[in-house]
Amino acid sequence: MGEKRQKSGYIYVISNSNFPSYYKIGVTEDIKSRLRTYQTSSPLRNYKIEYYIHHPDCYSAEKDIHEQMKHFATNIKNEWFEIGSLQMVIDRVDESLQPKEKILLDLYKK
C-alpha cells in the first residue's frame, strides 16, 4: 500500500533557445503530445525535444536522475537544470540508468 505503480514511458530533455545551457528533464507517456503542450505555452514555439529514451519505470528513473543532478537544479519544482552542454545532460541521464536497463534501453534511443 502507498507504493507507486511502475509505469513505462519516456524520459526526455527539452531545451529553449532563449535560455542556452538550461534543460528540462521530465517524463511523459507521449513525446509528441508533451512537446505540443510546451509549444502552446511559448508564443515563439521555441521548445525542442533534444533527447528521449524509453524506460519501463520512468517515474522512478526520473526521480533518481533529478536527485543525482540536484546541484545543477534551477528550480526542482519545474525540473529545469543549468548545465554546460546538451551532451553533458544526455551523458548524465544515461549514466543514471542502471547498467542492465541501459543495455535494453539502447534499442529505444532516438
Regions found by a protein language model. Give the residues of each.
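Non-catalytic accessory segments flanking enzymatic or RNA/DNA-binding domains
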Residues: 1-110
